[in-house]
């Protein structure tokens, strides 16, 4: 009875409208790069995508919302509401999840798929501890690879064995050379690299030796050839400063004046000294005994004066050898070589 009352042409039109609306609904969603802990979608990737198109990449964190909303609503969601509501994750299981190299998908305690670090350690022959480029000792190379996967993508093994305070017994791989930095830590560095010419004035660096280096690469190379740390005084070309007032340090650093050579250098002064009774007292270059090296640094930052360790223990306990003091002239506690050699 109903079909007899509707014109055949009207049925064709209704069928066309139905399929158009169905297709439009399938295309009207928004694709997001992640689902936050609050359950909302965050980091908008693309609008007007179907769930199938949004989720075909295989990324674990990709999510989708079906609401077809205007730009104003999207803006409010992202800025004021912590993301878009009704967030649908693309992946509910680990099936076809691509976590990338060194990772694999596992279901967590909440029965949700998560990418976890799982480096391939099957080809590692050295099973003992290794020293990383960050100056930390890892129990083995596999532990270092996991740390690299989690938070340090540039982390590499610099030499086998625990990190050392001297180049003695350090076997550097390939053509790299062992140098000791200003905090008395041994690092393996490459001296034969070719440094490109600077393309910007911002690349110039002033070394603790009062010499201007064209770039961090040039400072690395000079450090390597010297065999011990030069250290960074401040960014930019070296100037004939009369005091720290003439030196502009980057954010978070403070100028300390070295009265011995009449130069200033920028240092990090935000270190808090732990309350530990195990620290060894040090005799500083101002002939004052400090309870620890950290306490000496704290005093230096407070006074705006560069202080260096002359020797361990009380200043009254050892008659300093002038030759040894000369050897430590360029020591600097503010800029570990890891930050200089890996720029």
Curated annotation (Swiss-Prot):
Provide the alphabetized UniProt keywords: Disulfide bond, Glycoprotein, Repeat, Secreted, Signal
Protein source organism: Gallus gallus
InterPro entries (alphabetical): Fol_N, Follistatin/Osteonectin_EGF, Kazal_dom, Kazal_dom_sf, Prot_Inhib_GrowthFact_Antg, TB_dom, TB_dom_sf
Residue ranges constituting the Follistatin-like domain according to the UniProt record: 93-116, 166-189, 243-267
Query: SUPFAM superfamilies annotated for this entry?
Result: Kazal-type serine protease inhibitors
- Between which residues do disulfide bridges form? 31-54, 41-87, 55-90, 94-105, 99-115, 117-149, 121-142, 131-163, 191-224, 195-217, 206-238, 269-301, 273-294, 283-315
Repeat as a keyword of this entry, yes or no, is yes
* Signal peptide positions on this chain: 1-28
The protein's matches in Pfam families, at most eight in alphabetical order, are given as: FOLN, FST_N, Kazal_2
Q: Where is composition skewed (Acidic residues) in this entry?
A: 320-332
Principal localization?
secreted
Q: Which GO terms describe its biological process?
A: negative regulation of activin receptor signaling pathway; negative regulation of amacrine cell differentiation; negative regulation of embryonic camera-type eye development; negative regulation of embryonic pattern specification; negative regulation of horizontal cell localization; negative regulation of neuron projection development; negative regulation of retina development in camera-type eye; positive regulation of retinal cell programmed cell death
Name its cellular compartments. Answer: Secreted
Q: What is this protein called?
A: Follistatin
């Amino acid at each position: 009875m109903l079909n007899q009352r509707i014109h055949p042409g009207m049925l064709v039109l209704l069928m066309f409208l139905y399929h158009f609306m169905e297709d439009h609904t399938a295309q009207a969603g928004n694709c997001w790069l992640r689902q936050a802990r609050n359950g909302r979608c965050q980091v908008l990737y693309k609008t007007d995508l179907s769930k199938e198109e949004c989720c075909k990449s295989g990324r674990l964190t990709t999510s989708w919302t079906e609401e077809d909303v205007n730009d104003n609503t999207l803006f409010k969601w992202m800025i004021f509401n912590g993301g878009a509501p009704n967030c649908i994750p693309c992946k509910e299981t680990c099936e076809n999840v691509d976590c990338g190299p060194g990772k694999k998908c596992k279901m967590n305690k909440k029965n949700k798929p998560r990418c976890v670090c799982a480096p391939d350690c099957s080809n590692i022959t050295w099973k003992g501890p290794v020293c990383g480029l960050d100056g930390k000792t890892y129990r083995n190379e596999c532990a270092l690879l996991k740390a690299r996967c989690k938070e340090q993508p540039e982390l590499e093994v610099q030499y086998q064995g625990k990190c050392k305070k001297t180049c003695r017994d350090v076997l550097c791989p390939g053509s790299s050379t062992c140098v000791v930095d200003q905090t008395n830590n041994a690092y393996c560095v490459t001296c034969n690299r070719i440094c490109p010419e600077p393309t910007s004035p911002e690349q110039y660096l002033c070394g603790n030796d009062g010499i201007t280096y064209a770039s961090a690469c040039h400072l690395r190379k000079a450090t390597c050839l010297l065999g011990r740390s030069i250290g960074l005084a401040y960014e930019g070309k070296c100037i004939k400063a009369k005091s720290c007032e003439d030196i502009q340090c980057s954010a978070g650093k403070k100028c300390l004046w070295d009265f011995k050579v009449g130069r200033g250098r920028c240092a990090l002064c935000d270190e808090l000294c732990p309350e530990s009774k195990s620290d060894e007292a040090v005799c500083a270059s101002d002939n004052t005994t400090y309870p620890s090296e950290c306490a000496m640094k704290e005093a230096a930052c407070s006074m705006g004066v560069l202080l260096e360790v002359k020797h361990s223990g009380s200043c009254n306990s050892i008659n300093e050898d002038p030759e040894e003091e000369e050897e430590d002239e360029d020591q600097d506690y503010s800029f570990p070589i890891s930050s200089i050699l890996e720029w």
